[in-house]
């Protein structure tokens, strides 16, 4: 592997481990990417030493171009980008403001969608960023395919619209953000809302959106709290 971007590689590796610790993907499925420039991104790759999402290290994170070729000499020796690299590439192409894409397979998100339970703003101060995210709508890409080529990725991006997240029916979740941290934390919020929705349904209840006046009263606690403190907690809780 070529040198460079040590801190960025570690951040992507930490993000993969956080996703696994939060149950967003089992085993070795799922990947996180970080835009480096207009043509290249860091992404968790497949290789002879990978051990699964929960044990991702910086050595699993490699620099590639948008076509999956090495982003620097020696970068992919013995490694290959994930099959769903086009998913990451097309989300980043369509969103100049996005720096990171997370693709995971959260069981609760898949189950809630298949049960007909949309991701709705059913909570308030329990998760303020999550409530606001859900209030804006969480769209669904209605195909359970492996998003392994540009055509399928463009379909998913079209379903995503202008929203930062999209549920992939029978498959998982794609989340984007202005940072790796934001993209992962958004995925955690969607998963949390899906889990709550399933618990409500199991108890015989029905989803009810937070009243509009309560939603409007929720403050923006700022990135220092919503992202900074939240991310330090996610990394620390892994031990």
UniProtKB/Swiss-Prot annotation:
Pathway: Xenobiotic degradation; phthalate degradation. Transmembrane segments: none annotated. Signal peptide: none annotated. Its EC number is 4.1.1.69. Its cofactor is a divalent metal cation. Keywords: Lyase, Metal-binding, Plasmid. It is an enzyme of class 4 (lyase). It comes from the Bacteria. The keyword Repeat does not apply. GO terms for molecular function: aldehyde-lyase activity; metal ion binding. GO terms for cellular component: cytosol. The active site is at residue 84. A divalent metal cation binds at residues 84, 103, 105, 171. GO terms for biological process: pentose catabolic process. It holds the Pfam family Aldolase_II. InterPro entries: Aldolase_class_II_sugar_metab, Aldolase_II/adducin_N, Aldolase_II/adducin_N_sf. It catalyses: 3,4-dihydroxyphthalate + H(+) = 3,4-dihydroxybenzoate + CO2. The keyword Metal-binding applies. SMART domains: Aldolase_II (SM01007). Belongs to the aldolase class II family. Catalyzes the decarboxylation of 3,4-dihydroxyphthalate to protocatechuate (3,4-dihydroxybenzoate) during phthalate metabolism. This is 3,4-dihydroxyphthalate decarboxylase. It comes from Terrabacter sp. (strain DBF63). The gene is phtC.
